[in-house]
UniProtKB/Swiss-Prot annotation:
Biased composition (Polar residues): 112-134
Region Disordered, annotated ranges: 112-144
Annotated coiled-coil segments of the chain: none
Quaternary context: Homotetramer.
InterPro entries: NA-bd_OB-fold, Primosome_PriB/ssb, ssDNA-bd
Protein name: Single-stranded DNA-binding protein 3
Gene3D superfamilies recorded: Nucleic acid-binding proteins (2.40.50.140)
Gene: ssb3
Keywords of the record: DNA-binding
């Protein structure tokens, strides 16, 4: 079994590319995942390279940005390639099978949504309409 589940923050904006020929979308990014323990009172993190393919890659690139929290489930994959200097390089990365956006949008969008939810009231409570607009209904008019 090869299964990985991570929750962390993007270290920079995802990089979106398309494969030559088929044009399949592929996004790559690094996820900073906090460790469960602290060293000398400081939180430590691991920086995990992630690759996601297809529509999920496009959505990730379009809606996620540096610092946003996201969940990833997938598998660990290792590969190697020959670098330009002739040396053999080895890469270990997570190939995402599922991504979840746990935070998205800008802080301006979030505050605008909160303003709409709060209906412009400073203390956050919803303003009710005036009673003058309410028409009483006779129970006999209800068809059930």
């Amino acid at each position: 079994m090869n299964k990985v589940v991570l929750i962390g923050r993007l270290t920079k904006d995802p990089e979106l590319k398309f494969t030559p020929g088929t044009g399949t979308a592929v996004a790559s990014f690094t996820l900073a995942v906090d460790r469960r323990f602290k060293k000398e009172g400081q939180q430590e993190a691991d920086f995990i390279p992630i690759v996601v393919w297809g529509k999920q890659a496009e959505s990730t690139a379009n809606y996620m940005s540096k610092g946003k929290l996201m969940g990833v489930s997938g598998r660990i994959q290792t590969r190697s390639y020959d670098a330009k200097d002739g040396t053999r390089r080895y890469v270990t990365e997570i190939v995402a099978e599922e991504v979840q956006f746990l935070e998205w949008g800008s802080s301006n969008n979030n505050s605008m949504a909160n303003d709409q939810f709060n209906n412009g009231n400073e203390n956050g409570s919803m303003q009710l309409p005036d009673n003058n607009d309410i028409t009483p209904i006779d129970d006999g008019d209800i068809p059930f």
